[in-house]
Amino acid sequence: MCPVCQMALARVEGGFACAAGHNFDMAREGYVNLVLAQHRRSAAAGDPKESLRHRRVFLNAGHYAPLALALVDLLAAEAPQSILDVGCGEGYYLRQLAACAELADVDLYGTDVAKEAIRLAAKATPPVDCL
């Protein structure tokens, strides 16, 4: 949804746009920032880099793998057209979803207020649109 006019956003070359002409460009790292400049309270919103690094190490060690597999199985059985991971962090669950063959035709999206987290998610999950 467009943060300016609340119309639907569509994927366009280089980012996203709504029918009213509001455009949101994709950063070179592969994410799109939908937070309007006047609504930014801090350039460092969300988790600091060190917390993201620790979380990534913890998740990549497999501690939440059973949960991730159950989530993938549940969503694959539902056959959705798209999935939005709100608060996706660095994209751990999105990576699990993107790796599932049964979800290959599903549009995957991730959002997070932490600029560093969404940058990491976009870098680690290229088939996913990160906003």
Where are these regions (language model features)?
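Conserved SAM-binding loop of SAM-dependent methyltransferases across substrates and taxa
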Residues: 90-103
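Class I SAM-dependent methyltransferase Rossmann-like catalytic core
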Residues: 48-67
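N-terminal auxiliary segments of SAM/dcSAM-dependent transferases
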Residues: 1-44
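Conserved SAM-binding loop
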Residues: 121
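Conserved SAM/SAH-binding beta-strand->alpha-helix loop
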Residues: 112-116
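Conserved SAM-binding strand-loop segment of SAM-dependent methyltransferases
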Residues: 126-131
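Conserved class I S-adenosyl-L-methionine
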Residues: 80-89
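Conserved alpha-helix/loop element of class I SAM-dependent methyltransferases that forms part
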Residues: 61-79
